[in-house]
Regions:
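N-terminal targeting/trafficking signals and adjacent low-complexity tails
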Residues: 1-3
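N-terminal first-folded block
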Residues: 7-45
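Solvent-exposed alpha-helical segments within well-ordered globular domains of core cellular machineries
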Residues: 11, 31-34, 55-59, 79, ...
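Residue-level marker of positions within ordered structural domains that often coincide
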Residues: 18, 48, 82
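N-terminal positively charged helical leader segments and presequences
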Residues: 36-58, 67
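Anion (oxyanion) recognition and catalysis
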Residues: 62
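Short basic, glycine-rich beta-strand/loop surfaces that mediate nucleic-acid
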Residues: 66, 71-107
C-alpha cells in the first residue's frame, strides 16, 4: 500500500478517535468484533504487532467477517489516534469504517 493511502487511513482513524469511536485493547476489540449491532467494521493492525496478537485478531476477523488491515507500526498507529503503543484499533463509526475499506479496495 502506498504512503498516500496509509496517510488517508491514519487520518480517518484520527477522525474516529476525536469522535471517541475507536475500540482498542484486547477486551474491547473482542467485544467490538463480535458485536452484531455494528454492520460496517474494520480492524487496523500495526505491522510490528506480536505474531500471537495478529494471529488471534485475524482468526476473530475471519470468524466475524471483518476486514483486517495491516499498516504502519505501533507508534504511528498510536499517534494517529492520540494514544501510546497500540497494536490494533477497531473503528466504531460505520461511515469511517466504510471509508477506510474503500481506500484499501482502491488498490
Amino acid at each position: 500500500m502506498d504512503e498516500q493511502k496509509i496517510n488517508k487511513i491514519l487520518t480517518y482513524m484520527g477522525f474516529a478517535a476525536r469522535a471517541n469511536k475507536i475500540a482498542f485493547g484486547k477486551d474491547m476489540l473482542k467485544e467490538y468484533l463480535s458485536d452484531k449491532r455494528i454492520s460496517k467494521k474494520v480492524l487496523v493492525v500495526a505491522k510490528d504487532a506480536g505474531e500471537r496478537v495478529k494471529k488471534d485478531l485475524r482468526i476473530r476477523c475471519d470468524i466475524n467477517k471483518v476486514p483486517y488491515i495491516e499498516i504502519a507500526d505501533k507508534k504511528t498507529l498510536a499517534k494517529a489516534v492520540g494514544k501510546t503503543n497500540l497494536s490494533a484499533v477497531g473503528i466504531l463509526d460505520e461511515n469511517l469504517a466504510e471509508a477506510i475499506i474503500k481506500v484499501v479496495q482502491a488498490e
